[in-house]
UniProtKB/Swiss-Prot annotation:
Pfam families reported in the protein's UniProt record: Phage_Gp17 (PF17549)
Source lineage: Viruses, Duplodnaviria, Heunggongvirae, Uroviricota, Caudoviricetes
Record protein name field: DNA replication protein 17
Family that this chain belongs to: Belongs to the phi29likevirus protein p56 family.
Subunit structure: Homodimer. Interacts with the histone-like protein p6; this interaction optimizes the binding of protein p6 at the viral DNA ends, thus favoring the initiation of replication.
Statement: the UniProt record of this protein carries the keyword Zinc: no
Entry keyword Transferase: no
Organism: Bacillus phage phi15
General function of this protein: Involved in the replication of viral DNA. It is required at the very beginning of the virus amplification, conditions in which a low number of viral DNA molecules enter the host cell, possibly to recruit the limiting amount of initiation factors at the replication origins. Once the infection process is established and the other replication proteins reach optimal concentration, it becomes dispensable. Optimizes the binding of protein p6 at the viral DNA ends, thus favoring the initiation of replication.
Top-level taxon: Viruses
GO biological process entries: DNA replication; viral DNA genome replication
Sorted UniProt keywords: DNA replication, Early protein, Viral DNA replication
InterPro entries on file: Phage_Gp17
Length: 153
């Protein structure tokens, strides 16, 4: 069974790094793991919940424990075989349309740059004039000072 809980030593380490909690703990002569049960639990919880440092420390410790648990669980060879079969069986047709880099005529949209509508579409033919237009537009965009409008406002 997986255990994602912090150890008592990790909790003590987090408590020892937090000054507000230390003030509460300072009421005790020596802090042992069992002494945590003797602390004013409501006060301790309030301090932890109001301390970004304590919360982030606890979250970080829990994440480290979770990552370590996941590393230990990743020894399942059957799942690796299934993953390999899935990747090997993937075809280009299986890839969703949104991930395919291609401009379709039906996907025409109006884009503007400096107030001018850009209606140029890239064709597969590299020698076409539309590719030159796109390169020209890209050059204009790269040379354009976008901070110019911000300064005038």
């Amino acid at each position: 069974m997986n255990n994602y809980q912090l150890t008592i030593n990790e909790v003590i380490e987090i408590i020892n790094r937090n000054t507000d909690i230390n003030k509460l703990v300072a009421k005790k002569d020596n802090l042992y793991p069992t002494d945590l049960y003797d602390l004013d639990k409501q006060q301790l919880i309030a301090i932890i919940l109001n301390s970004d440092f304590a919360l982030s420390s606890i979250k970080r410790a829990l994440l480290e424990v979770t990552v370590e648990e996941l590393r230990e669980q990743d020894n399942d060879d059957d799942l690796d075989e299934i993953d390999n079969e899935l990747y090997e069986g993937a075809e280009a047709a299986d890839v969703p349309r949104e991930t395919i880099v291609k401009v379709f005529e039906a996907d025409k949209s109006i884009v503007t740059f400096n107030g001018e509508k850009l209606k140029h579409y890239v064709n597969v033919d590299d020698n076409s004039s539309s590719v030159d237009e796109v390169k020209k537009i890209a050059k204009e965009i790269s040379e354009h000072d976008f901070n110019e409008n911000k300064e005038n406002k």
